[in-house]
Amino acid sequence: MSEFATVARPYAKAAFDFAVEKQSLEQWQNMLAFTAEVTRNEQVGELLSGSLASETLANTFIAICGEQVDEHAQNFIRVMAENGRLLALPEVLQQFIQLRASLESTVDVEVISATELREQQLAKISVAMEKRLSRKVKLNCKIDKSVIAGVVVRAGDLVIDGSIRGRLDRLTDVLQS
């Protein structure tokens, strides 16, 4: 968990509540994603870690973001800058995404395989995970040759390792103990 998890929670909740009220969840998520990416820039990170006055810092950050942030987002940035929390924007984004997924009863499921899976295989995984989690799932597929064969499925804290690499690792652990 990020060092900013606790700090980011009230900001994520405030942004989420506002976005729900204004029916602009997608817009706010995109804005938060953009600002989070801006904070990851090395030079911007140094600027945010510096000793600029909060008003100057907010105005500079807003200028860097340009047209990507509307008036409401600018106010949000000003409040975060005033409290010295702009570096928490990546965590604010993550918590915003979780709140949105909870509202929409969806969960992101990461599927890792050695080769690209066919649509039929993905459909089976999707149905099985929806049944197990009692939520709609959004599959994010990745290819990782190190799994050798099979799949690894991750949804939050749940990890289902059906890969050959996982079996070999478990066998190694048993043989070593």
Curated annotation (Swiss-Prot):
Keyword Magnesium included in the entry's annotation: no
Keywords, in A-Z order = ATP synthesis, Cell inner membrane, Cell membrane, CF(1), Hydrogen ion transport, Ion transport, Membrane, Transport
Report disulfide bridges, numbered on this chain. none
Principal localisation: membrane
Q: Which Pfam families match?
A: OSCP (PF00213)
GO annotations of cellular component type: plasma membrane; proton-transporting ATP synthase complex
Subcellular compartments: Cell inner membrane
Keyword Lipid biosynthesis applies:
no
**Topology with regard to the membrane?**
Peripheral membrane protein
Superkingdom, taxonomy of origin = Bacteria
Q: Which GO terms describe its molecular function?
A: proton-transporting ATP synthase activity, rotational mechanism
Q: What does this protein do?
A: F(1)F(0) ATP synthase produces ATP from ADP in the presence of a proton or sodium gradient. F-type ATPases consist of two structural domains, F(1) containing the extramembraneous catalytic core and F(0) containing the membrane proton channel, linked together by a central stalk and a peripheral stalk. During catalysis, ATP synthesis in the catalytic domain of F(1) is coupled via a rotary mechanism of the central stalk subunits to proton translocation.
Family the entry assigns: Belongs to the ATPase delta chain family.
User: PANTHER family, per this entry?
Assistant: ATP SYNTHASE DELTA CHAIN (PTHR11910)
Subunit structure of this entry? F-type ATPases have 2 components, F(1) - the catalytic core - and F(0) - the membrane proton channel. F(1) has five subunits: alpha(3), beta(3), gamma(1), delta(1), epsilon(1). F(0) has three main subunits: a(1), b(2) and c(10-14). The alpha and beta chains form an alternating ring which encloses part of the gamma chain. F(1) is attached to F(0) by a central stalk formed by the gamma and epsilon chains, while a peripheral stalk is formed by the delta and b chains.
Q: What is this protein called?
A: ATP synthase subunit delta
Q: What is the source species? A: Photorhabdus laumondii subsp. laumondii (strain DSM 15139 / CIP 105565 / TT01)
**Encoding gene (name):** atpH
